[in-house]
């Protein structure tokens, strides 16, 4: 009996070791050639965009992961982290794969270039990406790093995605690329693009699966304690709240505005906001209506009216419709009401649904 218990305990210990430590590869690391993965970093890079893939891809003996930058200087990331790159373009090991993270803006007009926006004007960076892509086995962008791939000419004729807030802009600047919003990452074979931030981890997990199989990817996910859901298909850019146009928020958003609650899905969403304003509910609603009219949305039927005195009625809900670039029709309903008895507090409910 003692011999059986001892044997069982030893087997359990071996099993736990296999699934909990990704570095303990099932094959001998000494007999496998390591894949060099270079992760580009630059001033303004988003932290999770490069550290997420670094953690996942670095969790195993088969990959040698390192950061690379144009110069050896200290990099200041988004949110102020200070990082020293492992290598520069001049002294890096020859990469077999590269990761291009995002951060900052994407070169849109009227803003000071920062992060990716600044790198789009950096010929040394664009040249490194272009020349590396010609030699490596895999290229992956994270977030708005896709704009760097686009500038390097790597997305023409392909399908791609990016972070939710830049989907439409990528489609605008990359007319030869099919830009999608309903996928967390897009695999074109050699070129992989992912959504924003944590989507880079899923892109890295997918790459591990491509390179080493589903089992190795599962083992890695367990080792880094990541709830990997390869079949989930969740995409931030594919959620309906993104269909509420920015000018609506511009009307009521201020330093004291807070999101009270939110529910969002691919075909419908609801947001409840509380804000401070000296406007009455009717005045606030009127300004939101004017904002929607200014961007060519169409007023829909079904406006709800409320008596504010014996002789007047004021709308409390207005509805507007719009057809997006993919031909889908959306309706937004706006409800404005006092948040409390105290003057100067409003509750604004925004609902959007596909119709």
Task: Please report, for each region that a protein language model flagged, where it lies by residue.
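Positively charged n-region of N-terminal signal peptides that target proteins for export
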Residues: 1-4
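Bacterial N-terminal signal peptides
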Residues: 7-18
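Extended, subdomain-level signal for the structured scaffold at the beginning of enzyme domains
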Residues: 25-139, 147-151, 181, 205-355
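Residues that mark the start of a beta-strand
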Residues: 34-38, 159, 190
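Conserved Rossmann-fold dehydrogenase catalytic segment
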Residues: 180-194, 225-226
């Amino acid at each position: 009996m003692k011999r059986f218990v001892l044997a069982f305990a030893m087997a359990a210990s071996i099993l736990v070791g296999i699934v909990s430590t990704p570095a303990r590869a099932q094959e001998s690391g000494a007999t496998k050639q390591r894949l060099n993965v270079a992760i580009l970093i630059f001033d303004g890079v988003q932290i999770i965009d490069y550290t997420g893939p670094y953690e996942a891809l670095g969790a195993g003996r088969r990959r040698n992961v390192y950061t690379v930058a144009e110069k050896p200087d200290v990099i200041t990331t988004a949110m102020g982290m200070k990082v020293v790159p492992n290598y520069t373009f001049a002294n890096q090991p020859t990469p077999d794969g590269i990761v291009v993270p995002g951060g900052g803006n994407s070169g849109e007009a009227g803003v000071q270039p920062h992060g990716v926006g600044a790198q789009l004007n950096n010929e040394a960076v664009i040249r490194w990406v272009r020349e590396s892509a010609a030699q490596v086995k895999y290229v992956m962008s994270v977030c708005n790093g896709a704009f760097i791939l686009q500038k390097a000419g790597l997305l023409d004729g392909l399908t791609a995605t990016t972070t939710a807030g830049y989907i439409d802009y990528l489609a605008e600047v990359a007319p030869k690329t099919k830009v999608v919003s309903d996928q967390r990452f897009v695999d074109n074979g050699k070129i992989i693009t992912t959504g924003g931030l944590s989507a880079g981890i899923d892109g890295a997990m997918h790459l591990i699966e491509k390179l080493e199989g589903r089992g190795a990817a599962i083992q890695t996910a367990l080792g880094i304690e990541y709830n990997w859901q390869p079949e989930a298909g969740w995409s931030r850019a594919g959620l309906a709240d993104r269909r509420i146009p920015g000018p609506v928020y511009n009307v009521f958003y201020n330093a004291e505005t807070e999101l009270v609650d939110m529910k969002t899905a691919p075909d419908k969403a609801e947001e409840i906001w509380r804000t401070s304003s000296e406007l009455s509910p009717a005045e606030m609603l009127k300004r939101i209506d004017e904002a929607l009219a200014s961007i060519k949305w169409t007023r829909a039927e079904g406006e709800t009216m409320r008596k504010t005195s014996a002789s007047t009625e004021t709308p409390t809900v207005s509805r507007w419709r719009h057809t997006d670039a993919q031909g889908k029709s959306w309706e937004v309903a706006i409800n404005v009401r006092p948040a409390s008895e105290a003057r100067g507090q409003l509750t604004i409910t925004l609902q959007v649904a596909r119709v």
